């Protein structure tokens, strides 16, 4: 009997492209006026603009795929998003709660989650932990998906100061573990090792180099923590 929370970072930085666009290289020797077609009316050559796939889009797709799989397994799960601007404005968004059915309405709620403000992680972990504690499951797992370290306007005298946010988050994770909730932090930040090894319980984090591999890595992480084929 398993209950899992997927806690998704909704900080403003998750609006960044999942894969940075390739730079356009123009040869210095090329002269556009050598080709009369190159300076014709621009509407003569319509072009298709591909929508930019953002970090938040990959995260939402990953938890939606996991939701489908857990639904088939009969495992309970919830999807929440978090952000904030100071201690008086903590944002905790419900994509799917434990009591919600997995249907078009819950998928739409997850799809509507969008990048907001800062990465105020500690309070979100505490709130998600309280929701997990209320679920009568033998195994409880909290998976935090982020793209950077905890950060907010009042996390220390300088908003770039990492210490307060890291200590607050580490305390929230330790408190969750203390009441029997398995925690795991997943980040797509290449520098994630620098702070996650101090912030998370031993071995309870994963740094992903390729954001597009997030769905596959989440599946491996889940099976590794709850058991499976």
Residue ranges and their predicted role:
Residues 1-229:
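Acidic, glycine-rich A-domain
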